[in-house]
Every structure is written in C-alpha cells, then in structure tokens.
C-alpha cells in the first residue's frame, strides 16, 4: 500500500510543515515573548525594532529552508507510484474495524476544528463564571474597550477590503488559470510566508517613488495576491471541463472570442466563480500576517482588532476580543455559505 500512497503522504506532510513553519497569527497571539519563531522574529525586527536588515536575513533564511524541504520531498517522490494494483474488493461488513477507524479519524478532525470555535463563543458569553452579554452589547453599541476604533468601523473596513480583494482576485484568476506558466508564477504565495511578504512590502513601498506603505488600498491588493493561488485552483478544473465543441460551435455561428466567453464560458463557470469569490473574501477577512505590517489606525481589520484586544489586560477587554472573534467566524461562514 505504501508505494501507492507515499506521494500523497509526502505532499501532505510537506504542506503541514510549510503551514506550521510559516505560521504567524497563532504564534503572535499565543506564543508571547518566550515562544518565538522565525516568522514572529521577522515581525519583531521589522515593525517593532525597525531593523529591516536582520528581518530580511531571517526571511531569506526561511525561504531557503522551505525551498530545501520542497526539493527534498520532490526528490523522494516515486515516479511509478501512480500505477495501482487492483485487488479483489472485500466487504467491510466482515471487518468492522475498517469502518470504525476512519470514523474515529473523522470525528477527531471535526473535534479539533470545532473545539476552538465553540470555545471562542463560550468565552464571549462567560465572564467570572457567569453568563454575560456585555461584550456583545459593547460590540453592537459600536464601542470596543481599550481601542481607539469602533466595532462598526472595524467590521466595515474588513468587509470593504474583502469585497475589493474579491473584485481584484477573481477576474485575475480567470485570466491566469488559462496558462500553466502563469499558474506556477502566481502560486508562489502558497510557499511564501506572511512575514516574508510583509518585509518585502516594507522594503518596496517605504520610500519614493513607491511610498505606498500607509495607503489603505494596498491591503486589499495584498489580500488578493495571497488568495490568488487558491482562487486559481477553484477555477481551473471548471475551465478545463468546458467542452471545446461548445466553443467551436459558437465560433462557427460567427461569435467573437469575447462573445463566446460571455455566452458559453461564463454560464458554465458561474458556480466556480461564486466559490472563488467566497473563498477570496474569506481569506481576506481572516488575513492577519501581511496586514500586521501595513495596518494603520484607519485600516484596522477584524483579525488586527482581535489580536489587540486579546493582547491587553482586563477581563472585559479580552471578552470583547472573544466576542469579536466569534462574530468574525459568523461573518466568514455567512460569506462562504452565500457563495
């Protein structure tokens, strides 16, 4: 069995390593001073200490390690692993353990994913071991304790950025998904960490003639860049599934390539476009790493506000942070379900 699944296991392990090695939000909120990673140290050196040279060196070191891991795992893949040996199917009824084991894995995965979300909602409703809606009342009244921005401003900013990111990302994904070379180029954000992207933004847009680091419009653009690889993967299978005969028939009837695209491609791609729109908006709503390098007082998003609230002392302040986190989960789920 191992030769048949080795490539899939190695690919999955590589993705897990990359996502853990480049994790920033969890470390920034829960790690504190005693638990620093390369990612959090890049942020500390670049933003808090202003030492872009050290931050750049760490970012380059991180990129080298990621490239080395990708190279090693690619070399270990088995070229003949796709040839499967078909055996006689066996009934699962005679071996109940084969049904129980996958079910246990699924239940464990659901529990691991759902527990933090349920705990967030619970903490937003409980203060000093008693049920309290004070955090939710403060959010819906428009005020956030210990912050200079209102909850309405934070929510509005996040939604505007998410819509703008989707408007940039989805059309670009439709264009890029047609070319394999472009797909490879625009897939780089998958293996480039948020801190590396952030330090690159600081270096590139911190001086004339491109002194755009404090511009609000740069944040949704970066969100679109981060979401683009996943949007391409959501759109590409639908584009490949369009029958070429439909396009040929449209061209035979005298339709131009643009009319063919509007009348043939777009109706078929509509479900994929909606999924890509919801996906890009969800990624924008939850993006924390690169936004931390660019956020200003007038561009505070939901993840930034949550991190600021949870990082301040006070039971009421932290409960407001949990309530805002629960609200972000509801907004994200709503966006994805509508898409």
Identify the residue ranges that each predicted region occupies:
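Transmembrane alpha-helix signature in integral membrane proteins
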Residues: 2, 58, 62-76, 147-184
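C-terminal transmembrane helix and the adjacent membrane-cytosol boundary/short C-terminal tail
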Residues: 26, 56-94, 176-180, 236-245, ...
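Membrane-interfacial helix termini and adjacent extracytoplasmic/periplasmic loops
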Residues: 27-34, 87-91, 126, 133, ...
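Cytoplasmic-entry segments and transmembrane alpha-helices of multi-pass inner-membrane transporters
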Residues: 94-105, 175-201, 247
């Amino acid at each position: 069995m191992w030769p048949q699944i080795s490539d899939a296991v190695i690919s999955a392990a590589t993705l897990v390593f990359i996502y853990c090695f480049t994790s920033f939000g969890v470390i920034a909120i829960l790690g504190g001073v005693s638990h620093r990673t390369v990612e959090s140290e890049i942020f500390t050196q670049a933003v808090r200490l202003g030492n872009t040279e050290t931050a750049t060196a760490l970012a380059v070191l991180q990129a080298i390690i990621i490239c080395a891991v990708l190279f090693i795992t690619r070399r270990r893949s088995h070229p003949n692993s796709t040839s499967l040996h078909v055996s006689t199917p066996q009934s699962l009824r005679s071996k109940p353990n084969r049904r129980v084991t996958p079910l246990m894995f699924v239940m464990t995965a659901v529990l691991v994913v759902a527990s933090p979300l349920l705990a967030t909602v619970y903490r937003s409703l409980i203060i000093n071991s008693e049920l309290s809606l004070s955090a939710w009342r403060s959010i819906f009244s428009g005020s956030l304790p210990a912050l200079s921005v209102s909850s309405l401003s934070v929510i509005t900013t996040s939604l505007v950025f998410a819509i703008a990111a989707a408007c940039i990302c989805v059309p670009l994904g439709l264009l890029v998904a047609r070319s394999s070379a472009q797909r490879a180029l625009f897939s780089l954000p998958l293996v480039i960490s948020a801190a590396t992207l952030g330090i690159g933004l600081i270096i590139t847009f911190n001086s004339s003639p491109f002194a755009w680091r404090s511009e609000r419009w740069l944040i949704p653009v970066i969100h679109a860049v981060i979401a683009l690889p996943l949007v391409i993967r959501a759109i590409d299978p639908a584009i490949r599934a369009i029958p070429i005969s439909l396009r040929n028939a449209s061209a035979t009837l005298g339709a131009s390539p643009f009319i063919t695209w509007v009348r043939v491609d777009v109706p078929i791609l509509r479900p994929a476009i909606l999924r890509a729109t919801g996906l890009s908006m969800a990624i924008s709503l939850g993006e924390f790493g690169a936004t931390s390098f660019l956020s200003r007082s007038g561009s505070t998003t939901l993840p930034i506000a949550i991190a600021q609230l949870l990082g301040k002392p006070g039971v009421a302040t932290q409960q407001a942070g949990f309530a805002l986190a629960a609200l972000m989960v509801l907004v994200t789920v709503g966006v994805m379900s509508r898409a």
